[in-house]
Regions:
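N-terminal amphipathic/basic leader segments beginning at the initiator methionine
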Residues: 1-34
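Mg2+-dependent prenyl diphosphate-binding active-site environment of isoprenoid biosynthetic enzymes
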Residues: 11, 26, 32-262, 329
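Short, charged, amphipathic alpha-helical segments
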Residues: 14, 18, 206, 299, ...
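Residues at alpha-helix boundaries and the short loops/turns that link adjacent helices
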Residues: 52, 56, 135-138, 154, ...
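A short structural micro-motif
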Residues: 67, 150-151, 211, 273, ...
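Short, contiguous acidic/charged loop-to-helix segments that flank catalytic cores in large enzymes
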Residues: 235-237, 295, 315
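Mobile late-domain/C-terminal helix-loop "cap" segments
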Residues: 261-312
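Short, amphipathic C-terminal "tail helix"
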Residues: 304, 310, 317-336
Length: 336
């Protein structure tokens, strides 16, 4: 049994293990190649987060989904590079919008070089992803364009907030489907599609990816509250400080409205105050970590991960399917 990737994914098949490891190594080379520029400063900025590491969750899904067809097909590694470049580009932009100063345990690009360079570097990565996509054919371009549209729509919905009368939790889950589920779903879709898997298999894996992506982001929401920076590589409570609603906070507000408990209302008022104040921020984190809303968010994460597992039911039993099931379990384990 060998662990592959940061999730401690146990691969019990030597051929699968070798395929995944070789594929991930090729993706790493592809990422470094795709982020090179004739201008050294652009190379430095574009490779900043590549070299900082990361989970490479999306390329891993491409490699596993490719096991259901010709796992040596030439489009697999480039498509994995595309989804990771797209993901990295969104991180540059997210950190500007969130005013985050730490990403993957290093200074964020905006903290190091300013907002303009960070935004333009994200744009550069999108451009490089498009260049690779052009060689993968019109269907790949269309699939990526649809996912990118959903991703941006999710970001806009998050910024705009729920419309009057809309349940905030439902709105938030829709946001996550766009912001995170779309690209994770495309990772699975590309792996299956590029390997020439049957359309039914492509659809099943896409549904799995969509649900897993939401579970993955919900786990991140929990980690943002529950972990320290050593565990997550990010500043704890970044979303909290910026007033960005995440599921633990939404579950708290839901409970406060339903039960009217004084301590819940007081915590909501604290969250509505200026959390750029370090003492207030630390107190809000402490109270949320001990609040039932955090456990409710963990249960929500488990539910989405279980939905992802259920989506795999039509697939034949094989080591790749087992690995995908284990991956959904690993996502839940991250949330504690």
């Amino acid at each position: 049994v060998t662990d592959v990737g940061p999730f401690g994914l146990s691969v019990r098949d030597q051929a699968l293990e070798a395929d995944v490891q070789a594929g991930m190594a090729a993706v790493e080379e592809g990422l470094l190649e795709a982020t090179k520029s004739e201008v050294p400063f652009i190379t430095e900025a574009a490779q900043h987060l590549v070299r900082a590491g990361g989970k490479r969750f999306r390329p891993l899904l491409v490699m596993l989904a490719a096991q259901f067809g010709d796992r040596y097909a030439p489009g697999i590694v480039p498509s994995a590079v595309v989804v990771e470049l797209t993901h990295l580009a969104t991180l540059y932009h997210d950190d500007v919008m969130d005013e985050a100063t730490v990403r993957r345990g290093v200074a964020s690009a905006n903290a190091r070089w300013g907002n303009s360079v960070a935004v333009l570097t994200g744009d550069f990565l999108f451009a490089r992803a498009s260049h690779i996509l052009a060689d993968l054919g019109p269907e790949a371009v269309r699939v990526q364009a649809e996912a990118f549209e959903r991703l941006v729509t999710g970001q806009i919905l998050e910024t705009a907030g729920p419309q009057d009368g809309r349940d905030p939790v439902e709105h938030y889950l829709d946001v996550l489907g766009g912001k995170t589920g779309s690209l994770v779903a495309v990772s699975c879709r590309f792996g299956a599609m590029m390997s020439g898997a049957d359309d039914t298999v492509v659809d099943v894996l896409t549904q799995y990816g969509e649900r897993l992506g939401v579970a993955f982001q919900l786990a991140d929401d929990v980690l943002d509250i529950a972990s320290d920076s050593h565990e997550s590589g990010k500043t704890p409570g970044t979303d909290l400080r910026e007033g960005i609603p995440t599921l633990p906070v939404l579950r708290l507000r839901e409970r406060a409205a339903r039960l009217g408990l004084a301590e819940d209302i007081a915590l909501c008022e604290l969250l509505d105050s200026d959390l750029t104040d370090d003492d207030r921020h630390a107190e809000a984190l402490r109270l949320l970590r001990a609040h039932p809303a955090l456990e409710q968010a963990r249960r929500d994460t488990v539910r989405y991960a279980q939905d992802a597992r259920s989506a795999l039911a039509p697939l034949p039993d094989c080591t790749a399917k087992t690995a995908l099931v284990e991956l959904s379990d690993a996502v839940v384990h991250r949330a504690g």
